[in-house]
Each structure stands twice: as C-alpha cells, then as structure tokens.
Amino acid sequence: MSTTTNFWELLQQRLDELTKSGRAVADYLVHHADEAQYLSISSLARECKVAEATVFRFCRALGFEGYHEMRISLAQANATGALVNQHEPEPGATTASLCEHASGLFLTAINGTQNSLSPEAVEQAVDLMRAARQVFCLGQGGSMLLANDICARFSSLSNKFRTAGDSHLQILAASLMGPEDVVLFISYSGATRDMLETLRTAKASGAKIILLTHYEDSPGAAMADVVLRCGAQESPLDSGSIPIKVAVLYVGEVLLLRYMLDDPEHTSEAQDRTSEAVAIKLI
C-alpha cells in the first residue's frame, strides 16, 4: 500500500466498504487512537467485542498486509497528525530538558511495571526456578541480550542457569528438555514465530514455561505456566527502547531478590565462592 497515505485519510476512504463489525473496529480506533497503538490484536478484538479474524480482515480491507503494519501506520498518524503527543521533545529542546525527559521515560516504565507485576506470579516463577534442574533464559533479538543479562545475574548463585544463542540452538535445547526443566522466555509482544516454535517444543518435552511479556492475552502467554507482566508501554515506532529494556531487567532483579531471600544461607555461600573466584580478574 502507499506509504504516503495518512492512516486517517485511508480509513475515511475505505469506511463505506467496511462491514458492520469492521466499522466497530474503526469506531474504536477513532475514539481511542492513542491507546489502540499499544494494543495487541487480541486486546483490540476484546475491546471492540469482535473476533481476532475480524480485526485482521479490517486491516486487509484498508490495504495492510496484517495487524502489525496497520498498527505502525496508526502510530505514525498519531505522531504526525492532530493527535501528536505534546510531551515529546521538540528539535530545539535544550540538553537539560532532554535529560529530564529521558529520566521521566525510565521512571514511567519502571513504575508501570511495578504496578502491573503480580507478586504471586513472581513467587510462582521463583518456586519453579528453584525446583528446576536447569533454567534456560531465552529471547529473540534484543530480548536475547536481556535474557543473557538475567542469566548472568543468577549465575552467581547457581550453575543451573543457561542460555542458547539463536532460534536454532534454542529449539534444539527445547527438544532435549524434560519435566524438571524451566524456560524463562522474554518477549515483549509474546507473539513471534521463533518464540512460539521454541515454546511448543519445550512444552512438548514437559518443561515449565515462564514468560515475561507485556501482553497477558498473547499466544505465548497462553502457553506459559506463569506470566510476568512488563507494564511499560512501547509504541510500534519506538521498538526496542531502552526504558522498556530497563523495565524488563527490573523484573529480573525482583526474581533474583526473591530467589536469594528464599534461601539466604545458600545465597551467602554462593556469593562468597563466586566473589572469590572472580577476584583474580581484578588488577
């Protein structure tokens, strides 16, 4: 489709061609434009009281390949049109104001996650991790880097925490898991093909699944034994933003603290041994 056509102009052009249920989607987008750009297809369908297939057909009716492309177009229209966020910094902003703006983004991301993170889910996740033979910390793309960071933090307490480099190695590892193993998978969307392939394989092997995601109604969440929600919102135009990454690491730190405090004696011994081991690396 043409990239020069504004989403709202396109919607106006195709409005008469939409079905009754398609118009329900259009009406929701018009009245909740800013919120809608953050919703998964499942969440939007629920808000509109229609099936996910209806939302997908709506996207195709407007000329988009799928939901993700439509959501990006909506976000672009929100950013450049009358619905622009007045709190975004302008080109002439001072460096001091940018520092303040960035600080606000980080605080908002962490506070949003704190408010939406279930303490009960954290405890369930830690119970699974503590009882596991191996815990595989996995993700795709930037989320894999976060999984590596979380794995590294836990490695000072136990050698049962593992990572696997790419989607091929992850599915290989998943195929050899058993009921005593746990997967901690990080996926903001909870809806990537590689993630679903890995989780299906791990599930078939009997492994337990902990998913750290923003979307509790995502396909990945439906497969998980425990869902840890990252409450920070991310625009499709700002995918991979650092405040979102920090919010994910915040959840990782909460897991670590709970894990440590549930067995303080072992924690103290492990930290003493690992601290002594790495001391020789210092100059």
Where are each of the predicted segments found?
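CheY-like receiver
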Residues: 28, 125-128, 173
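Glycine-rich phosphate-binding loops that contact phosphosugars or nucleotide phosphates
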Residues: 130-250, 256-263
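HTH-adjacent hinge/linker in prokaryotic transcriptional regulators
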Residues: 3-9, 17, 23-24, 31-38, ...
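A short, charged, Gly/Pro-tolerant segment at domain boundaries
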Residues: 262-283
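Glycine-rich phosphate/diphosphate-binding loops that line cofactor/substrate pockets in enzymes
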Residues: 120-132
